[in-house]
Amino acid sequence: KRKSSMHVGLKLVKDKKADGFFTAGNSGAAMAVSMVILGLLDGVTRPAIGTILPCSNKRGHFFMLDVGANVDCRPEHIVTFAIMGSAYAKKVLHINNPSVGLLSNGEEEGKGDMLTKTVYPILKETNAINFVGNVEGKALFKGEADVVVCDGFAGNIALKVSQSVAKYITSVLKEELLS
């Protein structure tokens, strides 16, 4: 819909009348409208949703993508996400040589599902990034990597679980402090 807030907001970005766009709307719709209005960068075949999450390293945060745009990915999508995430970390988060990790169920090179096992050696040979290997879920919030890449299925689960745990801990602390 041409008069929807998403369409209007993204058109303002395209016309350089706005620097960015935030929405509380459906992420799938936001992606679709973004692709139609803004298009994709050269070499990018799939957009990704990224988010900044807190961690215990000296920076206090890391960037994770994809957290929900693409539930099924091919290895080249993950490589593109790694390059985009690294560029974002450099330009926006001001990290000179951001480390890039691949979300997996173990830190060893041979761990993971078929996608993870297939993309690992490709990321290892990608000169455009500082690949540091697999990052396990238990290590995410330690900040072992400045950028963590995965498909949108795994990323969305990791994001939603972390949000749920944060809400749970907050409610328990609030209950204990107020009782």
Where are the regions a protein language model picked out?
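N-terminal glycine-rich phosphate/adenylate-binding segment common to multiple enzyme folds
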Residues: 1-48
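Short glycine-rich anion-binding loops that position phosphate/pyrophosphate groups of nucleotides
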Residues: 26-29, 36, 107-108, 153-156
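Glycine-rich phosphate/nucleotide-binding loop
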Residues: 35-60, 64, 144-179
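A generic local secondary-structure boundary/capping motif
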Residues: 11, 38, 50-55, 69, ...
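Glycine-rich phosphate/diphosphate-binding loop of Rossmann-like nucleotide-binding domains
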Residues: 71-137, 146, 151
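Short acidic, glycine/serine/threonine-rich loops at helix termini
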Residues: 32-37, 76-77, 112-116, 159-162
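Structural motif
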Residues: 4, 11, 18-21, 28-29, ...
